[in-house]
Regions:
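Intrinsic disorder/low-complexity segments
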Residues: 1-25, 582-616
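N-terminal, positively charged nucleic-acid-binding surface of large information/translation enzymes
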Residues: 23-228
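Structured secondary-structure scaffolds
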Residues: 27-73, 125-129, 172, 195-433, ...
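Short, glycine-/Ser/Thr-/acidic-enriched flexible segments
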Residues: 38-39, 177, 221, 264, ...
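Hydrophobic, well-ordered secondary-structure elements that form the walls
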Residues: 361, 477, 513, 529-531, ...
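Helix-rich, typically C-terminal accessory recognition domains appended to large enzymatic cores
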Residues: 407-443, 453-558, 688
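Intrinsic disorder at enzyme termini
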Residues: 532-593, 607-628
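Phosphate-backbone binding interfaces of nucleic-acid-interacting proteins
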Residues: 607-731
Length: 731
């Protein structure tokens, strides 16, 4: 275990630093910004990059607005999954996480994500801060211990987290369901409820054993958390959807949180409790502060070692802003603020939550080649292109972002190449050919007014960036780019260049056009930093602030223009998708479930990259007689309605036309696989018509829709031939 000081790739250090002092009366802010920690058990993929790009854009924009920002992240490096994977690969957990850290930092740096410090949760700084918070909670009477019964793997001699146990659902009897809930019918249960449970690690039948566990009494903080929620809501630090979800959890009651795991486990041992380790979700968020401590100790960004205490004390005026995905809301808005408050420390200023990434309208898929790792993308396409496309879709809500490959290609080619870069490419040559590479010394009144209007319009982008409404900012930028291109087209400098009497007018047209280009570049810089840097090199300047855009740049030399961006070739996208299929074939080293820790908000692993492979999955089920099969009344149903179920993260509600049987309402646990349920309307599906109706808190489910796959996002509805009619029996 060590500090990650001195190991950070240069790109993580080159864009950062404290903003200059502001002399214009603007209130400047000092902000610590974090992204959720990637789990050190797999590669970074484009789903991860959505968040890292979102937070990096925000940090860059806030710095260009004049604020001081410190930007940190780390690998989440603890847990049973890492311990078991290291064992399977024949290396130590430390060696495993070190190799993953190097790959993660390289991927992030190559995407232009400029962390001031990128650490690991397996550091001395994190151990010390985690112990400090735990001991403060304990001293305050907010912890307790009690015996719990858990399933134990007698072969591996270890207690099994819920996600390491599979078996038959006690309700719908679907096979190979995880120990915390059925992904087919949506029922929540404990591992002890499973029928014929087995260990995902060894395949052995688990035994029920008792162990002492440690808990944080979350109910102690209910009043504080409700007050914090109200304050953050009123200050814009929590989105409405998050507030609504928190209120649901409050209504259900806050239960004590089990924060311990038994040896063997890779993590931090609880002080004074040999053989007991902190659950990964205890030390993971503390990793934000540990990474910041290491940054303070380094002396970079104008920080000093004692600045950590200034930042984390309860009355700190600095801000702490987290960017996370919607699957880990529970941990960041209940456990984390409670832990901090209980330790006498400051709570988060804002928790900014984003939706999931889909590709071509569906969940990322290994078989379709749309489960794309960051490195695979980088091997084929420019990272600024993805940054821009994500920006055109990112809004302040929890809406999912779809990477539609056709739209991606068209938007990049049209907006970045056709609208932005095109302005400079059409005018720069004339400045060098006729005017010695120098812009005009002044602009006439009409042109000055036109520039001022464009600059004023784009100044609204500062507030849009701050509000994380990047999509609106990009629309405004494209609008001004269209106006600039219309100006160039209307004046046709290529025609003016043929008439020597129009040289002065040509100089004015090219100067205004290139200032439009500069204006757009300044406002695009947080989104496409590498391309913007090349554009600024061409313009021979490096503006650090948005307010540099308010005045045109005149009577200065520019450099020779060279291509700043090229159009995306469809073949490159196709090659990337093919490479994704190849890089994720079964012969790759995968193996144990990547995350045993389900999020209470969603019931799914908060750090999962690839679905677990059951060692018993290939074992055939016991044979049944034809009479047993004949008991099932399988029918074709036509989907009349399909939508999300409020209050459930797993279920979709179907209304089927079942022919002579009338209409059937069925709740199906396939939400993870179908994020756009409205697209299922009109489809034929196969369902069990004679399953006893089941009363759920959402309504009565009148059957079961059949699907193929291993569960979670790997589920695929069974189709019936187009000739099949609603209500027809399936033989």
């Amino acid at each position: 275990m060590q500090s990650r000081q001195g190991e950070i790739p240069a790109v993580f250090l080159g864009e950062s630093g404290a903003a200059p002092c502001d002399n214009r009366g603007m209130t400047t802010r000092e902000i610590l910004v974090t992204s959720a920690l990637p789990y050190a058990n797999g590669q970074i993929h484009l789903g991860h990059m959505l968040e890292h790009i979102q937070s990096d854009i925000w940090v860059r924009a806030m710095r260009m607005a004049g604020h001081t920002v410190h930007f940190v992240c780390a690998d989440d490096a603890h847990g049973s999954a890492i311990m078991l994977r290291a064992e399977k690969e024949g290396i130590t957990p430390e060696a495993l996480i070190d190799g993953v850290w190097k790959r993660h930092t390289a991927d992030l740096a190559d995407f232009g994500v400029a962390y001031d410090h990128y650490s690991s949760t397996h550091t001395d700084a994190n151990r010390e801060l985690t112990a400090r918070i735990w001991l403060a909670l304990k001293a305050g009477g907010h912890t307790e211990s009690r015996p719990v019964k858990q399933l134990y793997d007698p072969v591996k001699a270890m207690f099994l987290p819920d996600r390491y146990i599979k078996g038959e659902c006690p309700k719908c009897h679907s096979k190979d369901q995880y120990g915390d809930g059925c992904e087919v019918c949506g029922t929540a249960y404990t591992p002890a409820d499973l029928i014929n449970p087995y260990s995902v690690v060894s395949g052995a039948t688990p035994e029920l054993k008792e162990s002492t566990h440690f808990f944080v009494k979350l109910a102690d903080f209910e009043t504080m958390l409700k007050d914090w929620l109200a304050q953050r809501r009123d200050a814009g630090g929590l989105q409405a959807e998050v507030v609504n979800k928190l209120q649901e959890w409050f209504a259900d009651g806050l239960r004590s949180w089990d924060v311990s795991r038994d040896a063997p486990y890779f993590g931090f041992e609880i002080p004074g409790e040999p053989g007991k380790f902190f659950y990964v979700w205890v030390d993971a968020p503390v990793g934000y502060l540990a990474a910041f401590k290491e940054l303070c100790d380094s002396g970079r960004n104008g920080l000093k070692p004692d600045d950590l205490e200034r930042f984390i004390r309860a009355d700190s005026t600095a801000e702490m802003v987290h960017f996370i995905g919607k699957d880990i809301i529970y941990f960041h808005t209940l456990f984390w603020p409670a832990m901090l408050h209980g330790a006498g420390l400051r709570t988060p200023t804002a928790v900014n939550v984003h939706g999931f990434l889909t590709v071509n309208g569906a969940k990322m898929s290994k078989s379709r080649g749309t489960f794309i790792e960051a490195r695979t993308y980088l091997n084929h396409l420019d990272p600024d292109y993805l940054r821009y496309f994500f920006a055109t879709q990112l809004v302040p809500s929890l809406a999912d972002v779809d990477l539609d490959m056709k739209a991606f290609e068209e938007r990049v080619n049209s907006h970045l190449v056709g609208k932005w870069v095109n302005i400079a490419s059409r005018c720069a040559g004339f400045v060098h050919k006729f005017f010695g590479g120098k812009l005009a010394a002044q602009l006439p009144a009409d042109e000055s007014a036109a520039y001022a209007a464009a600059a004023q319009k784009l100044s609204a982008c500062a507030a849009l960036y701050a509000a994380r409404d990047y999509a609106a900012a990009m629309r405004l930028i494209v609008e001004v780019a269209d106006e600039a291109n219309a100006y160039v087209a209307a004046n046709a400098p290529w025609t003016m260049a043929k008439d020597e009497s129009k040289r002065d007018a040509l100089h004015v047209v090219c100067t205004l056009a290139l200032n439009y280009f500069r204006l757009l570049t300044i406002w695009l810089a947080p989104v496409v930093p590498a391309t913007a840097a090349r554009a600024f090199a061409f313009l021979d300047e490096t503006p650090a602030r948005f307010d540099a855009a308010m005045q045109p740049r005149l009577n200065v030399a520019i450099r020779e223009f060279s291509a700043l961006a090229t159009r995306i070739d469809t073949k490159k996208i196709d090659a990337m998708i093919e490479a994704s299929k190849e890089s994720l074939q079964p012969n790759a080293p995968a193996t144990v479930p990547p995350s045993p820790q389900p999020s209470p908000a969603s019931g799914r692993g908060g750090k999962t990259d690839v679905a677990a492979t059951s060692p018993a999955a290939s074992t055939p089920s016991p044979t049944i007689s034809i009479d047993d099969f004949a008991k099932l009344d399988l029918r074709v149903g036509k989907v009349l309605q399909c939508g999300f179920v409020e209050g459930s993260d797993k279920l979709l509600r179907f209304v089927l036309d079942a022919g002579e049987l009338g209409q059937r309402q069925i709740f199906s646990g396939i939400r993870a696989a179908y994020q756009e349920p409205e697209k299922l309307i009109g489809r034929n599906v196969v369902f069990i018509a004679n399953l006893a109706p089941r009363k759920m808190r959402f309504g009565v489910s009148e059957g079961m829709i059949l699907s193929a796959g291993s569960g979670g996002n790997d589920l695929h509805l069974l189709d019936a031939d187009a000739g099949a009619k609603a209500g027809m029996p399936v033989k």
